[in-house]
Amino acid sequence: MQTIILGGGCFWCTESVFLSVKGVESVISGYMGGNAVSANYEAVCGGDTGHIEVIKVKFNESTVPLEVILDVFFATHDPTTMDRQANDVGSQYRSVVFYTDETQKPTVDRTINKLRDMGINIVTEVHPAVEFYQAEDTHQDFFNRNPGQAYCNFAIPPKLAKLRKEFSQYMVS
């Protein structure tokens, strides 16, 4: 098993995407990368801690390689706009990859360089993982538990449609 931490806007949205990927064993929403000694939703959304909304993705690389995890990540959020994903604005929504093992960094760098070679201006930050603060229970598996939530119904279906179209062989049936 491998673990990688990804920040691509609201963690409700990124969580929903990766819960739909074969070989992903778990997805935990949380916070990382800040300067405060703890993190919670209210403080992070207030911009007071420097933390980023992230998901911790634990996956079986024999089923879904890290390259595919990263390709899905970059395809299902906007890695070209600083501190913003759709209507979510603020540094807590920035695009970031936190690698948990030094062997992951070359793959992350290759993936970003491949996109840049295609003329895409990637602003995604890349850092070694630091302390992860698990989000409150109300934020875990949010969309599945709140299917009527308006923001999720606006933001998540297009991401899942893109996943289905571009990565169907890796999508949970």
Curated annotation (Swiss-Prot):
EC category name: oxidoreductase
Signal sequence range: none
Recorded superkingdom: Bacteria
Keyword Metal-binding belongs to the record: no
EC number: 1.8.4.11
Reactions mediated catalytically: L-methionyl-[protein] + [thioredoxin]-disulfide + H2O = L-methionyl-(S)-S-oxide-[protein] + [thioredoxin]-dithiol; [thioredoxin]-disulfide + L-methionine + H2O = L-methionine (S)-S-oxide + [thioredoxin]-dithiol
Disulfide bonds: none
GO biological process: protein modification process
Catalytic residues identified in the record: 10
Keyword Nucleotidyltransferase in annotation: no
Similarity comment text for this entry: Belongs to the MsrA Met sulfoxide reductase family.
NCBIfam families on file: msrA (TIGR00401)
UniProt cross-references to PANTHER family, sorted A to Z: PEPTIDE METHIONINE SULFOXIDE REDUCTASE (PTHR43774), PEPTIDE METHIONINE SULFOXIDE REDUCTASE MSRA 2 (PTHR43774:SF1)
Function: Has an important function as a repair enzyme for proteins that have been inactivated by oxidation. Catalyzes the reversible oxidation-reduction of methionine sulfoxide in proteins to methionine.
Designated name of the protein: Peptide methionine sulfoxide reductase MsrA
Gene: msrA
